[in-house]
Amino acid sequence: AGDEVITSAYTYTASASPAVHVGATLKFIDVAPDSFEMDYEALEAAITEKTKVIVPVDIAGVPCDYDRIFDIVERKKALFHPSNDVQRAIGRVIVAADSAHAFGASYMRDGERIMCGNVADFTSFSFHAVKNLTTAEGGALTWRPIEGFDDEYIYKQFMLLSLHGQTKDALHKNGLGNWEYDIVAPSYKCNMTDIQAAIGLVQLDRYEGLLKRRRDIIERYDEAFKTLGHLTVPHFTDRHTSSGHLYLLRIPGIGVDRRNELIVQ
């Protein structure tokens, strides 16, 4: 329908490919100078009457500047033309965060600490094998309440998309007398298994300690690099607390060829 989705150019394909799956047009925004986040001025300039979703990327586990992003979509509200009931209820460009790196991160808003997952309109997390918390594969999705929509309705839409368009999830289907179900759409198959969930629950029990250990390591790195003039990600500030997923370092005068040589060495 000509809809547009905007995301960061500095990310993994998962931030962008869902837009392609639904036939939308992608717009990539490069990072700002001396930053790992989107150039927010370029983001604002890229919004048109066709823009439906912005996908900020919480790179390395550091939350984006969501206050600035929401200010932008509010200023551009007059351009927004909703094409479904959820878009009409939200009434502006939707902010759907790629927080694959940021499970356990938090963001300060009006003096209140808000956990990542309750900042953007929708937030996706990854539990891939290399993430802080893993279920071997898979992830999770959260959303803020949408006026006029019951959470159970939103959940069911995701259930239909992730389980072949089946009208009952595995838990309800296995209840006494509940075996019968319908297929209402040719959807995907990406639901989490019980075994994966069990692994995740064990990880959750120890996750607070894992986050603390990552913070300890990052603070040691920060201390070591602070006088060298390298660009690093600000993991812990008055605005946010990172999950510490990656420690990114940009060294002046060192390009990708030298980086690759060091990795091989």
Where is each model-derived feature located?
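PLP-dependent aminotransferase-like
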Residues: 1-104
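Short conserved AdoMet
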Residues: 48, 128, 226
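Structured loop/turn residues at beta-strand edges in well-structured enzyme cores
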Residues: 49, 91, 117-118, 190, ...
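PLP-dependent aminotransferase class I/II
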Residues: 53-57, 62, 66-70, 146-265
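Short regulatory "switch" loops immediately downstream of catalytic or recognition motifs
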Residues: 65-81, 95, 104-109, 137, ...
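Conserved active-site segment immediately N-terminal to the catalytic lysine
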Residues: 83-133, 179-183, 232
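Active-site PLP attachment segment
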Residues: 101-103, 118-167, 194
